[in-house]
Amino acid sequence: MKRLWQHCHAATLKGGKYSIVEDAALVTDGPLIHWIGPRAELPPGDYAERIDLGGAWLTPGLIDCHTHAVFGGNRSGEFEQRLEGVSYAVIAAAGGGIASTVRATREASEEELLASARKRLEPLLRDGVTALEIKSGYGLDLASERKMLRVIRRLGERLPATVRSTCLAAHALPPEYAGRADDYIEHICSTMLPALAGEGLVDAVDAFCEHLAFSPAQVERVFIAARELGLPVKLHAEQLSSLHGSSLAARYRALSADHLEYMTEDDARAMGEAGTVAVLLPGAFYLLRETQLPPIDALRRHGVAMAIASDLNPGTSPALSLRLMLNMACTLFRLTPEETLAGVTLHAARALGLEASHGSLEVGKLADFVAWDIERPAELAYWLGGDLPKRVIRHAEEVYRG
């Protein structure tokens, strides 16, 4: 069924630029974009429905390409402690930090995790997100990681959004493997990944390469295991120190390397040559009061595509707004509004391997788009909060109206 969407302007994000079409029209045929361009050039046709968008601006549906949205409990108490000057080391020694989230996630039922994650994700979806990634990594044993990944799959079946599932078993060392990181990595590679991939629960594999998590050599073992299973890889890298994990990610043609505050020029060059996307996470940078900025100029010099994501998680980025991350990326990291919009559309799609079907308003791609109540695209990075979407459209069907 063909629909005509008109009386609008469009920032198509074709090629990662605004690529603006004034007085635009868009034709959908089933779930796909059939035609887009100036309304004056609209070819004649029969349409089952004509939708007047009232002068709204259209953009591709937003894509949150890095979240940890499935978890038990929350850590608001620790947030208060940190503000009172208690160090993370003291909190962790008392059983807090990621260990507390692992306990709560292991104890929660699948239904409880599903309900809490859905509640967290609703604000993102109402604000224009039509695709997202969710990572596991708070289970850290086979049964609990399976539970998390099953919840992620169920969210994909129930939410009006495309949901990609990433296995992050190599997120932290579980308490039962204390002092035996190599043994845990072996367990991931020989048992967990084959089982979870065999059940169809995994779209990609991630790891945390950092001095408080896993070494590059350990991460490489995970990458090799993922490659043998035919799964693409991603990496948390260079958030707190430089271990050149981003260069390792580039060597394995990772979809993305994420955080990157401490990456070097050589790391950026390697990522540019490999086509690995840099996923920047200003929410975690802000909450942790970091001062080491990602090397944005180096990423630009080497042609590295930059995505922006919420990093929604209970410890370092309890962020329920992807649009807020656009403003943070501009004000904290000095990206342009155009770069940030590309970062939550086309480049975010690339970071999930979805660029053929998502991320820009082009013929043949899915008709996932948002009609915004704004006067120019830069407003998406300018306003802090507010209900800006007039309509959120997924697969040519309205899923939210403001």
Swiss-Prot record:
<dbReference type="GO" id="GO:0019557">
    <property type="term" value="P:L-histidine catabolic process to glutamate and formate"/>
</dbReference>
<dbReference type="GO" id="GO:0050480">
    <property type="term" value="F:imidazolonepropionase activity"/>
</dbReference>
<keyword id="KW-0369">Histidine metabolism</keyword>
<keyword id="KW-0479">Metal-binding</keyword>
<comment type="function">
    <text>Catalyzes the hydrolytic cleavage of the carbon-nitrogen bond in imidazolone-5-propanoate to yield N-formimidoyl-L-glutamate. It is the third step in the universal histidine degradation pathway.</text>
</comment>
<feature type="binding site">
    <location>
        <position position="66"/>
    </location>
    <ligand>
        <name>Zn(2+)</name>
    </ligand>
</feature>
<dbReference type="GO" id="GO:0019556">
    <property type="term" value="P:L-histidine catabolic process to glutamate and formamide"/>
</dbReference>
<keyword id="KW-0408">Iron</keyword>
<keyword id="KW-0378">Hydrolase</keyword>
<dbReference type="GO" id="GO:0008270">
    <property type="term" value="F:zinc ion binding"/>
</dbReference>
<feature type="binding site">
    <location>
        <position position="138"/>
    </location>
    <ligand>
        <name>4-imidazolone-5-propanoate</name>
    </ligand>
</feature>
<feature type="binding site">
    <location>
        <position position="315"/>
    </location>
    <ligand>
        <name>N-formimidoyl-L-glutamate</name>
    </ligand>
</feature>
<feature type="binding site">
    <location>
        <position position="68"/>
    </location>
    <ligand>
        <name>Fe(3+)</name>
    </ligand>
</feature>
<feature type="binding site">
    <location>
        <position position="239"/>
    </location>
    <ligand>
        <name>4-imidazolone-5-propanoate</name>
    </ligand>
</feature>
<feature type="binding site">
    <location>
        <position position="66"/>
    </location>
    <ligand>
        <name>Fe(3+)</name>
    </ligand>
</feature>
<feature type="binding site">
    <location>
        <position position="316"/>
    </location>
    <ligand>
        <name>4-imidazolone-5-propanoate</name>
    </ligand>
</feature>
<dbReference type="InterPro" id="IPR005920">
    <property type="entry name" value="HutI"/>
</dbReference>
<feature type="binding site">
    <location>
        <position position="138"/>
    </location>
    <ligand>
        <name>N-formimidoyl-L-glutamate</name>
    </ligand>
</feature>
<protein>
    <recommendedName>
        <fullName>Imidazolonepropionase</fullName>
        <ecNumber>3.5.2.7</ecNumber>
    </recommendedName>
</protein>
<feature type="binding site">
    <location>
        <position position="313"/>
    </location>
    <ligand>
        <name>N-formimidoyl-L-glutamate</name>
    </ligand>
</feature>
<feature type="binding site">
    <location>
        <position position="68"/>
    </location>
    <ligand>
        <name>Zn(2+)</name>
    </ligand>
</feature>
<keyword id="KW-0862">Zinc</keyword>
<dbReference type="Pfam" id="PF01979">
    <property type="entry name" value="Amidohydro_1"/>
</dbReference>
<feature type="binding site">
    <location>
        <position position="236"/>
    </location>
    <ligand>
        <name>Zn(2+)</name>
    </ligand>
</feature>
<feature type="binding site">
    <location>
        <position position="236"/>
    </location>
    <ligand>
        <name>Fe(3+)</name>
    </ligand>
</feature>
<feature type="binding site">
    <location>
        <position position="311"/>
    </location>
    <ligand>
        <name>Zn(2+)</name>
    </ligand>
</feature>
<dbReference type="InterPro" id="IPR032466">
    <property type="entry name" value="Metal_Hydrolase"/>
</dbReference>
<feature type="binding site">
    <location>
        <position position="75"/>
    </location>
    <ligand>
        <name>4-imidazolone-5-propanoate</name>
    </ligand>
</feature>
<feature type="binding site">
    <location>
        <position position="311"/>
    </location>
    <ligand>
        <name>Fe(3+)</name>
    </ligand>
</feature>
<feature type="binding site">
    <location>
        <position position="171"/>
    </location>
    <ligand>
        <name>4-imidazolone-5-propanoate</name>
    </ligand>
</feature>
<dbReference type="GO" id="GO:0005737">
    <property type="term" value="C:cytoplasm"/>
</dbReference>
<comment type="similarity">
    <text>Belongs to the metallo-dependent hydrolases superfamily. HutI family.</text>
</comment>
<dbReference type="InterPro" id="IPR006680">
    <property type="entry name" value="Amidohydro-rel"/>
</dbReference>
<comment type="pathway">
    <text>Amino-acid degradation; L-histidine degradation into L-glutamate; N-formimidoyl-L-glutamate from L-histidine: step 3/3.</text>
</comment>
<dbReference type="GO" id="GO:0005506">
    <property type="term" value="F:iron ion binding"/>
</dbReference>
<keyword id="KW-0963">Cytoplasm</keyword>
<dbReference type="InterPro" id="IPR011059">
    <property type="entry name" value="Metal-dep_hydrolase_composite"/>
</dbReference>
